[in-house]
Amino acid sequence: MTGFLTCWDGSEYQLPQLYEWRLCYGLGSPCDSFEVCALWDGVRADLLAQFTRFRGVWKDQTVFTGVVDECESCRDGNGTRLMIRGRGMAALLLDNEAVGADYQVATLDDILRDHVTPYGITVGERGTFPAVSPFSVDTGSSEWQVVE
């Protein structure tokens, strides 16, 4: 797998060859997670605090996209290693507070438009859901709670 990290300014950095990776898909929990490890020369350590997104690519296909929660470098007798940990894009829904709102009628499109896509999350396949009337979003609830 090839790993790419994106900084807050949109610049992208390709990780050195990964020697270990773990992708966990939630299967019912609200958030997927990842952990990747690479040998690292320590150059550009100043970038570590600027990474916000991770993208894992396998055979030219993106297999994971997520939010970087933690970057750690460790040096020992075997060299310097870089470990990146984080969560899937749903983490943005868990971490952000929804603005309170009352909908007379809320469709799936309304909910996705107002509470999911503003965080850069795109929805691939989706089912059909009937409109909900009325629908209220409580101030202080997470965006995940709105979608759930």
What are these regions (language model features)?
Residues 1-102:
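Assembly/oligomerization scaffold segments
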